[in-house]
Amino acid sequence: MLTQQELKQQAADAALELVEQVAGPDVIIGVGTGSTADLFIDGLACFKGRLRGTVASSERSAARLAGHGLAVLDLNDVQSMPIYVDGADEIDPNLHMIKGGGGALTREKIVASVARRYICIADESKLVERLGRFPLPVEVIPMARNAVARGLSRLGGQPALREGFVTDNGNIILDVAGLSIADAPGLEKTINDIPGVVTCGLFALAGADVALLATQDGIRRLERRG
């Protein structure tokens, strides 16, 4: 039986096959953040010299990419990318996701928005029927912490400060347990509209286009309906 780490590697390898299909001297690949994304980055090293470069969603991923000799570009200098590859903390059959366990949710949303296709890579344990067992990360401007926490509580959530953590943008994270996420796009908009919220870790208004889920029997591929 494959371990979870081996399943993550399987998912990363499947995404590298998609990179092989689009690789070229003018191609830029968007790269996410997290343990599965790290494995993708390590595999991407074999494309050194075959890509124009990469765009990273965090300082952590940028450092790992640079360590492999891959060019890391400023998103402001990039007009489009064929694919953005990232993991997920949870993903449902509609390819809506909860992300942000690594705290890079805002930059992940920004980089993903520039890519033509969002490729989610994960092991099968991340697939759920309904989002919400994983606490929802919310990036918050520090001065608004208590006001935002009250707003999240009114939505039925139980927000907790992620102690000792500061995002790459200089903000804090509230991890929100207990939310009922029957309408992920609607809840994403509602939370994002709370003054002081930078963004929440729901990726539903713009979810994944393709999910590559590693199972004991190989890769299960899901594509966004419609």
UniProtKB/Swiss-Prot annotation:
SUPFAM superfamilies reported in the protein's UniProt record: D-ribose-5-phosphate isomerase (RpiA), lid domain, NagB/RpiA/CoA transferase-like
Disulphide-bridged cysteine pairs: none
Record Gene3D superfamilies: 3.30.70.260, 3.40.50.1360
The keyword Hydrolase belongs to this UniProt entry's keyword annotation: no
Annotated metabolic or biological route of this protein: Carbohydrate degradation; pentose phosphate pathway; D-ribose 5-phosphate from D-ribulose 5-phosphate (non-oxidative stage): step 1/1
Superkingdom of origin organism: Bacteria
Reactions performed catalytically: aldehydo-D-ribose 5-phosphate = D-ribulose 5-phosphate
Database matches in Pfam families: Rib_5-P_isom_A
GO terms, molecular function: ribose-5-phosphate isomerase activity
Cellular component aspect of the GO annotation: cytosol
EC number: 5.3.1.6
GO biological-process terms attached to the record: D-ribose metabolic process; pentose-phosphate shunt, non-oxidative branch
Binding site for substrate: 33-36, 86-89, 99-102, 126
Keywords: Isomerase
InterPro entries according to UniProt: NagB/RpiA_transferase-like, Ribose5P_isomerase_typA_subgr, Ribose5P_isomerase_type_A
Active site: 108 (proton acceptor)
Subunit structure: Homodimer.
The family this protein is said to belong to: Belongs to the ribose 5-phosphate isomerase family.
Job description of the protein: Catalyzes the reversible conversion of ribose-5-phosphate to ribulose 5-phosphate.
Protein name per its UniProtKB record: Ribose-5-phosphate isomerase A
Annotated source species: Bordetella pertussis (strain Tohama I / ATCC BAA-589 / NCTC 13251)
